[in-house]
Amino acid sequence: MTLKLHDLRPARGSKTARTRVGRGDGSKGKTAGRGTKGTRARKQVPVTFEGGQMPIHMRLPKLKGFRNRFRTEYEIVNVGDINRLFPQGGAVGVDDLVAKGAVRKNALVKVLGDGKLTAKVDVSAHKFSGSARAKITAAGGSATEL
């Protein structure tokens, strides 16, 4: 005999009816498994309720200050990174930094002064820190803001 689609049945015990509480006098009847009287018998208790103890969300301090919605975020590149990525020197732009994987594309770039610079580089970026500008010019290069 071949198995047909109409012969298929769900596994025994896999399909059970939803328990209807509060119907009749059985184990889930009358008080519906909630016991007699008290808060939990009459209504739901919130998940955050800790039995009268001061709740954790009220014990912890609030966050101070605010986050400026109009702040401009910059991708950071240090002078040492430029020295490592471009040891031969030359012109270094944002596109070159993206190609080397130092920054994401379409990002504003700020050059900071951490590290040493030995090669002469002409860097063009959106912002420079004072120490970065000083190190680039000391190495014989130039710092151009876009």
Swiss-Prot record:
Domain of life: Bacteria
Keyword set includes RNA-binding: yes
Gene Ontology, cellular component aspect: cytosolic large ribosomal subunit
Database matches in InterPro entries: Ribosomal_uL15 (IPR030878), Ribosomal_uL15/eL18 (IPR021131), Ribosomal_uL15/eL18_sf (IPR036227), Ribosomal_uL15_bac-type (IPR005749), Ribosomal_uL15_CS (IPR001196)
One Gene Ontology biological process: translation
An MF annotation (GO) of this entry: structural constituent of ribosome
Amino acid composition bias (Basic and acidic residues), ranges on this chain: 1-10
Record-given protein name: Large ribosomal subunit protein uL15
Function: Binds to the 23S rRNA.
NCBIfam families linked: rplO_bact
Record keywords, A-Z: Ribonucleoprotein, Ribosomal protein, RNA-binding, rRNA-binding
Region (Disordered): 1-41
UniProt KW Ribosomal protein keyword: yes
PANTHER family, A to Z: 50S RIBOSOMAL PROTEIN L15, LARGE RIBOSOMAL SUBUNIT PROTEIN UL15M
